[in-house]
UniProtKB/Swiss-Prot annotation:
Gene from which this protein is expressed: HIR4
Residues with lipid group (N-myristoyl glycine): 2
Protein name as it appears in the record: Hypersensitive-induced response protein 4
PANTHER family, A to Z: HYPERSENSITIVE-INDUCED RESPONSE PROTEIN 4, STOMATIN-LIKE PROTEIN 2, MITOCHONDRIAL
Topology with respect to the bilayer: Lipid-anchor
Length: 292
């Protein structure tokens, strides 16, 4: 609902003040409510001012220290000071233009001393400087500056494209570093695993051979004790032949073996046969001697 008034009286709504004149001269500030005026005494309501907070967006184009053209968007929130409403009513005809002019002046004095990166980092300082300057100037005209926000900093499109490319290149470089470190760690862990596997495999082979050696020793001793007249070498030869045939049998039973290299010459077969025959004859001879 707006303010309504006539020559004899008027109603001033909440968050507003009226400027009352007498014979064309300022007399007093009228608070919200219903007021009566005496036109015969030259009293009348000259105008009404709102004390609500108003917002003004200002766009400023300027250049940074590193020769980059940017556009800054400032949002200024201001209001009329109730106690100084007469100054706001009489002193300034267009407060928005006055505010814009001072914002332009301050921003264009500060930004050329900053690089683009510094401007992004210190935009709060720029807003603070604008606020301090406006408070000093506009306070004399009955206006209070509530807040100033540096809403946006918009570089030239070509500069933005270059900044995005630089950012992308830096991220790719960082990603390659992380990837290299990950591959390095993976290779180190793989090498450690292989070394550990070889170590454990060696330990297993050593234990296996130790067990075989212990078993052969025990077999030789048992055979020598039970069969008189046999030497340890003869028992060892017999065991080796037995293991030879066991190995051939295992190779033949395995489905995964495709090629087996065996001694195939007549001499090798004869040697094996002689060893078996001699072993059996010696065993039989020792048995007869024991019977006699």
């Amino acid at each position: 609902m707006g303010n309504t008034y006539c020559i004899l009286g008027g109603c001033i709504e909440q968050a507003s003040v009226g400027v009352v004149e007498r014979w064309g001269r300022f007399e007093h500030i009228a608070e919200p409510g219903c007021h009566f005026f005496n036109p015969l005494a030259g009293q009348w309501l000259a105008g009404v001012l709102s004390t609500r907070i108003k917002s003004l967006d200002v766009k400023i184009e300027t250049k940074t220290k590193d020769n980059v053209f940017v556009q800054l968007v400032c949002s200024i929130q201001y209001r009329v000071v109730k106690a100084s409403a007469d100054d706001a009513f009489y002193e300034l005809q267009n407060p928005k233009e006055q505010i814009q002019a001072y914002v332009f002046d301050v921003v264009r004095a500060l930004v050329p001393m900053m690089t683009l990166d510094a401007l992004f980092e210190q935009k709060g300082e720029v807003a603070k400087s604008v606020l301090e300057e406006l408070e000093k100037v506009m306070g004399a005209y009955g206006y209070s500056i509530e807040h100033i926000l540096m809403v946006d900093i918009i570089p030239d499109p070509s500069v933005r494209k270059a900044m995005n490319e630089i950012n992308a290149a830096q991220r790719l470089q960082l990603a390659s570093v992380y990837k290299g470190e990950a591959e390095k760690i993976l290779q180190v862990k793989r090498a450690e695993a292989e070394a550990e596997a070889k170590y454990l495999g060696g330990v297993g082979v050593a234990r296996q051979r130790q067990a075989i050696t212990d078993g052969l020793r025990e077999n030789i001793l048992n055979f020598s004790d039970k069969v008189e007249g046999t030497s340890a070498k003869e028992v060892m030869d017999l065991i080796m032949i037995t293991q030879y045939f066991d190995t051939i049998r295992d190779l033949g039973n395995s489905s995964k073996n495709t090629t087996v290299f065996l001694p195939h010459g007549p001499g090798h077969v004869r040697d094996i046969s002689d060893q078996i025959r001699n072993g059996m004859m010696e065993a039989a001879a020792s048995t007869q001697v024991n019977d006699v």
